[in-house]
Amino acid sequence: MCFRTQLPLGRGKGAFRACVDGQMASVFKTYREWKISGDTQWLKQWWPTVKSLLEYAWSEKNPDCWDRDRDGILEGRQHHTLDWELFGPSSWLEGMYLAALEAGAEMAEYLGEQETAVRYRALFCKGYTYMKESLFNGDYFIQQVDLSCKDYIRCYDCPEYWNEEQKQLKYQICQGCEIDQMLAQWHAGLCGLGDIYDKQQRQTALRAMFRNNFKTSMRDFTNAWRVFAILDEQGTVMCDYPNGVQRPVIPIPYVDECMTGFEYAFAGLLIQEGMVQEGLQVLRAIRDRYDGEKRNPFNEIEYGSNYARAMASFALLPIFSGFAYDMVRGHIGFTPIEKGTFRCLWSLGPAWGEFFQEAACSTIVIRDGALPVSTATLGNAGKIVSIWADGENIPFAQEGQTVRFDATTVKTTLRFETAL
């Protein structure tokens, strides 16, 4: 895939090199859209393309050799959304690769390609083990790279990445605490992909990120890049180098900036992992900066006005509602962070509506479309005593937080009454 879509649409393909995080995300976003829609025919149509996107990582046609030796570890020249390249494994891009492998394995398995699924999962396991053992420094996840090694420059013919004065690679994370070091886990939580990073390690890393990257004041913080937070404003910086760890002379681009799209994803991951107050603090810092007096609340600037990445804020809706979905198997679920009365919007391919959580019942209301469903998870409901689909009482079986019933297409309401 080309790094950027050419606009306006119809101009044709760009000629720039492929982007690791964008290409891998296209794989698991396909998985996400399949689960949202339940449209397996659509998946079958695009599956050959999706496979080629994932397998480009080790393809001989890939001049950047992301995973040429097929060991599940990204080691080549890795272009990314921050506009330059990383050399050597990083938890950020490795995580995106692992999420794509996991999504690819599940899609392959469903489509009957068992051998493909086995290959993808074997690569996932190798990469997961490497990341757990070699990319976690005991406090947070890092990039493994030798800044003094000029072999990368020779191998990929990219002299622009070498700082001759300092004899050092440019634009690398190295030992820094980077805001996207577990971005793939945020995506995985939204898509239902499970663990991409070790649970205990990611909890430790999130605490370190909040401690190091979240700044309660910018007065004593030096930022030579673009200034999106000043004076007593709070914000989360892109990459911090705590406790005297080596900071490259020319580190990863935008290293000291506060950009809301990245901050929203970080806040979302904090909340997904149970660190709700920390996540809310990150969110309040953003909204305080864009309060309508200091800055336009409808234009959170990153690389320019109305930059799309700020729409990561919309992920907070499924995160706070604990929204789970799988239209392929007819499943929907809600486990709101708020245990009491709660109300939210939900949206899937076949239908959209509202969810209401109350003391004695939980109700899924369909505002448009029809919802084909046979299982539901209600994380806060307790024991279900009756289920009503479009006003009709239906039989069911409950296993923990999940209820199962005969497949039905709900057109108005699906109501779950609970024992008090």
Residue ranges and their predicted role:
Residues 1-6, 46-71, 122-140, 153-168, ...:
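Long, well-ordered core segments of solenoidal/helical folds
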Residues 1-77, 85-108, 121, 128-131, ...:
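Aromatic-rich carbohydrate-recognition surfaces in CAZymes
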Residues 10-23, 81-95, 166-184, 194-195, ...:
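Solvent-exposed loop and edge beta-strand segments that line ligand/cofactor-binding
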Residues 36, 109-110, 191-193, 269-275:
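Alpha-helix C-terminal capping/termination sites
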Residues 116-118, 130-143, 195-204, 216-221, ...:
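Acidic/polar loop patches that form or flank catalytic/metal-binding clefts of enzymes
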Residues 132-256:
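Extended ligand-binding clefts on enzyme/binding-domain cores
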Residues 229-232, 252, 257, 263-399, ...:
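Non-catalytic C-terminal accessory modules of carbohydrate-active enzymes
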